[in-house]
Amino acid sequence: MGFSFVTNAAIAAHMPPSKQEIIRRDAKFHPTIWGDHFIQYLDTPIDPPQKVVERMEELKKQVRAMLRDTNLDISLIDWIQRTGIAYHFEEQIAETLKHVYEASTLTTDSSKYLEHFDLRHIALRFRLSRQQGYHASTDVFKRFMDEGDKFKQSIANDIEGMLSLYEASFMSVKGEAILDEALAFTGKNLEATLPNLTGSLAQQVECALEIPLRRCTDLVKARRSISCYENKNGRNEVVLELAKLDFNLLQAVHQRELALLTSWWNELGASTNLPFTRNRVVELYFWVLEVLSKPEHARAREIMVKSIIMASILDDVYDVYGTLEELQLFTSALERWDLQALEQLPNTIKTAYSIVLRVFKEYEDLLKPHEVYRVGFARKALIPYMNAYFLEAKWFYSHHHPSFEEYMDNALVSCGYPFLFLVSLVGLDEIATKDVFEWAIKRPNIVVAASMICRNRDDIVGHKEEQERGDVPSGVECYTKDHGCTEEEACMALQAMVDDAWKDINCELLHDTSMPKAILMRAVGLARIISILYQYRDGYSDSTHETKAHVTQVLVQPIPL
């Protein structure tokens, strides 16, 4: 497990200095808060201690036996998924949830069968079925509603039932009024009840109200859930111990990958040669890790994290550093994609271009001969991404204020997610076929939805700082101007689009899709990380608050055993 970074000779040539001084913008990004912290893990053994491996195998054997039990309480599956160890038992869980769905939906006496379950179990069965890709019906909740299609006030006293229904409501697709009502009802009542709760239930409600399970990334969810489960009465000690050991084992792997990545970044020289760019190597690794979190994703992580570091550099070149003339030359050079273009570029732009060429060369070095065709798709996805950046630069220099529609048409590309989704597939195994890349390059619906979530959340929490820096109008300003509304109303409208985009993602993940779930889940991961990084602020540009806390929990502090 781990990365195998390659190094190439730097391409260095210098243009004579311009006779006319150019005034550059300064975004005043804070320096890295991690520095070379993770270098210390370079000497971490690649293989975990044999005693840990043997203990984990014994625990996994016990969990498999539990999953074969016909009297299994599906709450155990829920906690196995929450605590991050479900990837060890995917086949057994899939088989169990298939039976759960069929018993709840396809049997002739399914309604009578479900009468034996309370609200907590009904909502849990619904959520787990939808998570598995089954189109479970919302009719199962009707017996908890009154004649006015409102939830009965009596269930407000059932905190576990309300929490389960609240989490289930985030599995909705468009047009499901019952789940919309469920979210409004449970959200209001859980917020009112939270101050009176204690213990594990209080932890669960607090975490759910902050980030529901559907929108939370795998490793943040696992860390939080292990803490909640440890305080829960009736917990399964085997599951708890396995979850702790697994989390710490993976954390050690990720720390070593970050050590290699930090060395690669230092050798790249971007902090010295491109000092205006953000050094967010650790934060970007965290971003990618929550998209590609499984151990077998090591190669895919390496390719994607190099890509997102490159994308961040390019973002700052277009958004902060470059003049319109320089950016025209740069964009044209990227479109031509040849070394000769380097000679026509100013020194700093040349450095950025050499990084792009290097990263794409490293793609090829990491891929097998029959996989190298994937690099062409990545290059094809990069060009419209850079053209979208260049259009925003033209807006900036011409003082153009786009309409909201014009802004969004470009922003759904300039957010970078169509490119990042495609490169998240480049390092995957045989599941990423040529047909998958042909599909991904066309910006499918699930990628558009993830892009909407990324763009709108970034604009909602970061537009004020962007305007203070003198950036082009964000979606908030464009919407406000088009609709003659307040900033608060514009933010509410953009958040409604985010919620609708999540419903689109849910719809795409139901079983009638033609793409493997393992491919689609990369888009889900991209959407989820936005819930973490852009919840209260732009947690990428300013990573000193919540982002630092998340990184610390996931990548620095092991779980006490």
Swiss-Prot record:
Keyword Manganese: no
Lineage, top ranks: Eukaryota, Viridiplantae, Streptophyta, Embryophyta, Tracheophyta
Native source species: Piper nigrum (Black pepper)
Protein name per Swiss-Prot or TrEMBL: Terpene synthase 3
Catalytic activity, EC: 4.2.3.133, 4.2.3.-
UniProt xrefs under Pfam families: Terpene_synth, Terpene_synth_C
Domain-related comment: The Asp-Asp-Xaa-Xaa-Asp/Glu (DDXXD/E) motif is important for the catalytic activity, presumably through binding to Mg(2+).
Reaction(s) catalysed (UniProt annotation): (2E,6E)-farnesyl diphosphate = germacrene D + diphosphate; (2E,6E)-farnesyl diphosphate = alpha-copaene + diphosphate
Locus of motif DDXXD motif: 315-319
